[in-house]
Amino acid sequence: MKKHFFFIFMFLLMTRICAFAYPNMIVEHYTAERGLPNNIVNCTLKGQDGFVWFGTWYGLCSFDGTKFRSYDNHDGFYSADIPPRKIQRIVEDRNGYLWIKTIDRKLYLFDKKHESFHAVYDDVKEYSENIQIIKIQTTDDGDVLLLTKDKSLLRANTDQNGKITMKQLHDSRPNVNVYD
């Protein structure tokens, strides 16, 4: 009986000691009142630059650890026809450019140095009849894979100046042979 009591006592003592070994976690909630452009955050990315990037219902937002910065087009500053809103996914390529997929399946490139958006429509349309982007994913070497609605698969990358290069990995369009 004394053995059982001793083991139970030691077990309870050890669990109590282990509970104190964990550091206190501080959880902060960020809302529109604290700087987010919208309370709906669809995706996040920790960039190579250390910033945390948020894709929100109202557009792109960065956080440097102390303050938020929204990249909207209220002042007409950004070069894209319509800056991305309703962002669904953000990935970063090897050169630090952000590839942004929106809920309406459009694709944008964000240049962090110049704080400019580029609609990637013209770069994709020669490879796919349906330019709606279903999924974006980075590869181990920093390229970006793009899956279109018609199931074409593209591999994209940027150079140091932001010029986009695309290569088609899979063409879903059927081969059409024309005979006289």
Annotate each predicted stretch with a short phrase:
Residues 1-180:
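Carboxylate-rich, polar loop motifs that coordinate divalent cations or form catalytic acidic clusters
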